[in-house]
Amino acid sequence: MTSHTHPASVTYSNHIKRLIEVYENAINIISTNSSGPSSHIESVLIHSGCEGHYFGDDRGIPFQAYGHFSHWLPINQPYQFLHIRAGEKPVYFQIIPSDFWYEQNIDLPDWCSEQFQLVTLTAANQLPQHLQGKGIAYLGEPTELLNSLGLSEDMLNPPALLHYLDFNRAYKNEYELEQLRAANKLAVAGHSAARECFLKGGNEFQIHMAYLNACEILENECPYTNIVALDEKSAILHYQHKRRGSGANSRVLLIDAGCRVNGYSSDVTRTSVRPGVNPLFQQLLIKMEQLENDLVSLVKPNINYTELHTYTLWAIAELLIDLRICRSNAADLLEREIPQLFMPHGVGHLLGVQVHDVGGHQADHNGAIMLPPAHSPALRNTRELSQSMVFTIEPGFYFIPLLLEPERNGDRAELFDWTLIDELYSCGGVRIEDNICVTSSGAENLTRQFEAGS
């Protein structure tokens, strides 16, 4: 298949054209509205990042390229550089060391490489002799090269430039949506295999391996550490272990796991139960599935993401009353911030080349910040929804002893049915998460479209 017939050839070309336009607009706006060194930016040099090692060891830490580099190139290698100049083809400085210890070749498909002027070097210290002109802004992890490049600290990750670029990362073009759909399709296959393993009595380690095998990925190729939690461990929001003990008696699985395709990440969570689970928890799972679907149906342009979070807290307050986990009424529980004890996280976040993508609290490209409400400081997204914006929707409901036990002898103790809560601690919690793109009139669910029966 030639580059011109590859499915990504046209959309990737348009993606690069769009990025060039964004960067040129950023430079023009900054030069007009800023003072100091930032007003003299003429081009941008992006560094993929440095290779790290564990302290006192020569073993390398798994590398993750800088997000603004990954936005341009699907290359996850350290010491790569991209130079963007107004009106010219971007230059990709491909650093390939002469090395017999490790594989250093970079497999760049034709449909990708043809968008760049490619300059191959054997070491990053050869870079300065190939850079011409002044006013170079540097984005990424600092290196010793900065001195030889003659860049001032004011041109290192200039805030005005980052504000503009971070804000625009929320909006995805067709190439980006193609990668996100592919990443979701892979993740859905992995989740299906994980659920099947769980239903057969698999333990956390076996479920984790079933996911990796179905997706045909290595652990360090995951966009984040897979959360594979059985029973009470599902109340630990970012549970990181994979227990190898028997899973035969487990009743609840919460798995939060994604995939990465050409740098773009999916972030999908499913909760499953086995026969014998607490009937009330089974009811809770059904109602949380419905809540997640309801939230997706509310997505449309020109509403604020915070509204979705507020709706979620109200729905959880109603669930607490309906399931008789709490007493009083939903309005009272909401006023007294009881739902936050059962869902202490936000209802989602922006998604792209980073799982928790940048710019979630920005009001505009100048860097003005919209803080989350005081009652929900963990909310990662406060943006107004616009067409082509991609984020997660992930309501959760957990029985977390660390949050609930202080209430047992506190001023609000009478609100809780402690007998029920004690019974439900062993079930852990529920989280349901899909990846969503805002359309002109509603939403595309990038995840559910790949599930059988959806």
Regions found by a protein language model. Name each.
Residues M1-S454:
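Active-site neighborhoods and metal-handling regions in enzymes and metal-associated proteins
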